[in-house]
Structures are given as structure tokens and as C-alpha cells.
From Swiss-Prot:
Molecular function in Gene Ontology: adenylate cyclase activity
GO cellular component term of the entry, any: plasma membrane
Identification of the protein by name: Uncharacterized protein Rv1318c
SUPFAM superfamilies (UniProt xref): HAMP domain-like, Nucleotide cyclase
Main location: membrane
Length: 541
């Protein structure tokens, strides 16, 4: 199956190459085909493009129909001959004259009528409900217009040739009307394709009227009826007339039926295949867009250009992506307010009040002389300074897999080991504290901050009420880190840690710290042995 491609697949590839209308292509055009232009294209250029395309499609479809009709009346049913058995003024005068007149007048009138129905889009304004209705009716009106011109031609030629020989009546009645139905069906499909940009603009104003949107099934059955059902009925009528008139030999009748059957089969297949191809295009566009969303491209948005269930599919995709964007925005805001780790934990588990005992390391950071800082600078400068200060804190805490639990004025409380567990939270906390102290000296020499590090058992969880709570940690290490931060403000390096936290760290991290004397911290009964880092950058003079 993979080695041999079907005829339909080969034809599909040809059309995809010509029109680039395929979801397999890396850059799927907004309207499904580059022939229809870009969404940002000016209305004037779009009008010219669509008018030229419609005229070309209408003329081409009619020329093909005329060629098939000529084939049917001359070769499929050769007797009586329209050349030998009819006057020359009719075959070489009236017929070509009407064909040229109808082709020129019909192409101009139908194209102009379609452009008039799209006047609202050309003027760049929102359509009224009636204008929206006329826009969606445009393909049907083009098809009906072709049926009228071909119907007049059928009546005229059948009458004129029938006056000469009544054997011409069934031939022209069937052949011309048969081709007219095929041409009308083809122009309907082509017009619907060409008007996609305007249909998209109309759909932005609201869904199409329900009676103009029969759906995929209704549209498919109508095309089948006009492209295959009616021609088959015509074949049956031709056979019935032949049974009555008996003006063909058995071989001539068989040849005629075979030719007409082949024409019906081929053109019916082509029409149904084009319909299926046009129907599949929006699905392919959605599929390509889904792949982009899977890659995380949530800015993906589709142009809704179909008035059937396929348009609902495109609209539903846009609603889905809008919901995903909103969800991602809320997730981002949630993570910024409570911390990425807390937000991720809240998504994984059902949030509830209470907590659990955890072994964590705590880093408390507070700016030295914050009161003087606030009174000596304009408020805007203070906010800018604080944002730069906290940016350093957040950057280093995130880099060491910690959590900035809260900002308290010009201070911050960071946790290592909750809510996400760490193999050795002391290592991460001590390394982050050293990095913050070093960066503050180098990047913000005008702003000094005391840093305290402690470790131990705490209760970590959601504290508050059911309507409003926040994730935090409660325990002795938090108080100890705050007291060490106060003490560090008056010490060289502005960074102190408890010996207990340093002792619990890895050998590599312990080598970066030196133990000092015991100090009784405010609010503590037992003295705490201090530790300070070695090799920190000294403050600039």
C-alpha cells in the first residue's frame, strides 16, 4: 500500500503542489492555499485577486463544458449529423454566437454580482446580517446563474434543431443540460473556494444563517445529485427516447451510452474528489495547528473560513487555544505569586490546610539600613532598587532549586527542601547564600544585606483559612535564620550560618565555611555556634 500510491493520492499531490493547500506542508497558508493570499492583504488587492480568479475559473469551467457538449452531440450520438443535416447558419452562426455572448455576458454579470455582494468587505466595514447572508449565498447564486444561461442555451438549441429534425430534441436536451449541471456544480465548488477570505471576514461577525449551512453531509449529497445523479437520469431518458424514435443503429446507441457513461463517471468522480479535497483542507489545517500547539506554540490561531461543521471545528480550536493561553497565563501568575514549586505541587495534589514535618534549610535576607534608604531616595528609585535586589535573590534561589516563600518589605524568606524534597538542602542553601552575597557586592555595592542560614525540622504546608491560605514553613530554623540575619548585618561579609547547617552539608561545601564562637541569639535559650564563609568578595571601597 505504501509502495504504490492511488490515483487519488497522486492527483492530490498535484493539486497540493499547485495550490499549496495541504496540512502536510511546513507553513500551511491561513486560508489553506497561497492562491487566496494572506490575512494581512489589503482589501483592494484581495478584490482584484478574487475577481481575476473567479473570472478565470468561470471561463475555464464553461469552456470545458462546451467541449464536452460538443463531444456528446457530434461523436457520442453521430446521427443525424449536425454538420451535414442542418443549415450552416445554425451550426456555424447561431450556436457560436450564443456561446460567445453567453460566455462574455455570463462571466461579466456573475463576477460583478459576486463583487457587489462583497461590497462591505471591499469598503472595510462589518457586514450587516443581510450582507452576511448574501456573502454565503454567493456560490449558490453563481451556480444558479450558470444553470440559467445553460438552460436558455438548452431550450434555444433544442428548439432550433428540433424544428429541423425531431431526432435532435433528446440529443440537445440531454447533452447541453447535462453539461450545464456539471459546469454549475464545478463553479459552485470553485466559487466557494475562492471566497474563503470573505467568508472568514463574515464569520468573524457571527455564524452563518442556519438555512444557508446544510453541513458537510448536505453539501456532499447535493454535489453527488448534480454531478452524478442527474447525468444518470439523463442516460435513462436518452435510452427511453431511442426506444421511441429508433433513429440509431445498435452500435451507435451502444457507443453513445458508453461515451456518456464514461463522461459521467469521470466528471462525477472529479467533482466528488474536489469536494472531498476541499472538505479535508480545513481538517488538515487544524491538524497542522494542533501539532504546533503540541510543541508549545500557544499563539497559534486559525482563520475560520468555512460555514459548515468544519468552521465550527476551526472556531472550537481557537476557543481551545484561547483557553490554554488563559490557563498558561493564570499558571504563570500563580507561579509568580506563590512560587513555581508551590504552584506545581498544588497542581499535582489537592490543596488543603495543614502541613507535614520536613527537614529544610532556611535563608533569611534583609537589607541593611532600609529606613535610611527609603527616606533618602525617591519612591520610584527605591522600588527600582528593591526589584534589582530581589531579582538577584530569586535568580540564585531558583538556580539552586529553592523556593522564595515570601517577600516582607525589604526582606525575603527562602526555603530549600520544601515543597520539593532535596537530597541535601543545606548544600543548596549555603551555596545560594554565598552566591547572593557575592553578587550583591559586585552588582549592587550601594545595597548591603544581612544573610542568615539555618537548617532543621519544620512544619511545611498551607496555613490560613479555607477561603484564603498560603504555603509557608513554621519552626525553629526560621526564627534562627532571622536572628542570624540580624547579627550578620554588623559582621564583615554580612553572611552567617549556624554550625549545625554547615555540619550537615557535604564535605565540599563545609570546606567553604569556617566555624566561629558560640553566640546566644535573641529569643533563644541555648547558644548557637556561628559559621562564616571563606573567600567571599570584599565590598568595594
Amino acid at each position: 500500500m505504501s509502495a504504490k500510491k492511488s490515483t487519488a493520492q497522486r492527483l492530490g499531490r498535484v493539486l497540493e503542489t499547485v495550490t499549496r493547500q495541504s496540512g502536510r506542508l511546513p507553513e500551511t497558508p491561513a486560508y489553506g492555499s497561497w492562491l487566496l493570499g494572506r490575512v494581512s492583504e489589503s482589501q483592494r488587492r484581495r478584490r482584484v485577486r478574487i475577481q481575476v480568479m473567479l473570472t478565470a475559473l468561470v471561463v475555464t469551467a464553461n469552456l470545458l463544458g462546451i467541449g464536452v457538449a460538443l463531444l456528446l452531440v457530434t461523436i457520442a450520438i453521430p446521427e443525424p449529423s449536425i454538420v451535414r443535416d442542418t443549415p450552416r447558419w445554425l451550426t456555424f452562426g447561431v450556436v457560436p454566437g450564443y456561446v460567445l455572448l453567453a460566455l462574455a455576458l455570463g462571466s461579466y454579470a456573475l463576477t460583478r454580482q459576486t463583487v457587489q455582494a462583497l461590497r462591505w468587505a471591499i469598503e472595510g466595514r462589518k457586514p450587516t446580517r443581510e450582507e452576511e447572508r448574501r456573502t454565503f449565498l454567493a456560490p449558490w447564486r453563481v451556480a444558479v446563474g450558470h444553470l440559467m444561461f445553460w438552460g436558455v442555451g438548452t431550450a434555444l438549441l433544442t428548439t432550433l434543431y428540433g424544428l429541423i429534425n425531431n431526432a435532435f430534441i433528446p440529443r440537445f436536451l440531454f447533452a447541453v443540460s447535462f453539461c450545464g449541471v456539471l459546469v454549475a456544480t464545478a463553479t459552485y465548488l470553485h466559487t466557494e473556494f475562492a471566497l474563503r477570505p470573505f467568508a472568514a471576514q463574515a464569520l468573524e461577525a457571527g455564524p452563518p444563517p442556519r438555512r444557508l449551512a446544510p453541513g458537510i453531509l448536505g453539501r456532499t449529497m447535493v454535489v453527488w445529485l448534480l454531478g452524478s445523479g442527474v447525468p444518470v437520469v439523463g442516460i435513462a431518458l436518452m435510452a427511453m427516447f431511442e426506444m421511441v424514435l429508433l433513429n440509431l443503429t445498435r452500435m451507435q446507441f451502444a457507443t453513445g451510452v458508453l461515451i456518456i457513461s464514461m463522461v459521467t463517471l469521470v466528471f462525477g468522480f472529479i467533482l466528488m474528489w474536489i469536494l472531498a479535497w476541499l472538505t479535508a483542507t480545513p481538517v488538515r489545517v487544524v491538524r497542522a495547528a494542533l501539532r504546533r500547539v503540541e510543541r508549545g506554540e500557544l499563539r497559534t490561531n486559525l482563520v475560520v473560513f468555512d460555514g459548515t461543521e468544519l468552521g465550527e471545528l476551526q472556531r472550537g480550536f481557537n476557543a481551545m487555544v484561547a483557553g490554554l493561553r488563559e490557563r498558561e497565563r493564570v499558571r504563570d501568575l500563580f507561579g509568580r505569586h506563590v512560587g513555581r514549586e508551590v504552584a506545581a505541587a498544588a497542581e499535582r495534589e489537592r490543596s488543603k490546610l495543614g502541613g507535614e514535618e520536613r527537614h529544610v534549610a532556611v535563608v533569611f535576607i534583609d537589607i541593611v539600613g532600609s529606613t535610611q534608604l527609603v527616606t533618602s531616595r525617591p519612591p520610584a528609585d527605591v522600588v527600582k532598587l528593591l526589584n534589582k535586589f530581589f531579582a538577584i535573590v530569586v535568580d540564585e534561589v531558583d538556580r539552586h532549586h529553592g523556593l522564595v516563600n515570601k517577600f516582607e518589605g525589604d526582606a525575603s524568606l527562602t526555603i530549600f527542601g520544601a515543597p520539593n524534597r532535596l537530597p541535601c538542602p543545606e548544600d543548596k542553601a549555603l551555596a545560594a547564600a554565598r552566591a547572593i552575597a557575592d553578587r550583591l557586592v559586585n552588582e549592587m555595592p550601594e545595597c548591603q544585606a544581612g544573610i542568615g542560614v539555618a537548617a532543621g525540622q519544620v512544619i511545611a504546608g498551607n496555613v490560613g483559612a479555607r477561603e484564603r491560605f498560603e504555603y509557608t514553613v513554621i519552626g525553629e530554623p526560621v526564627n534562627e535564620a532571622a536572628r542570624l540575619c540580624e547579627l550578620a548585618k554588623s559582621r564583615p561579609g554580612k553572611l552567617l550560618a549556624s554550625a549545625q547547617a554547615v555540619d550537615a552539608a557535604s564535605e565540599e561545601e563545609r570546606a567553604r565555611w569556617s566555624l566561629g564562637r558560640h553566640v546566644k541569639l535573641r529569643g533563644h535559650d541555648q547558644p548557637v555556634r556561628l559559621a562564616k564563609p571563606v573567600g567571599l568578595t570584599k565590598p568595594r571601597r
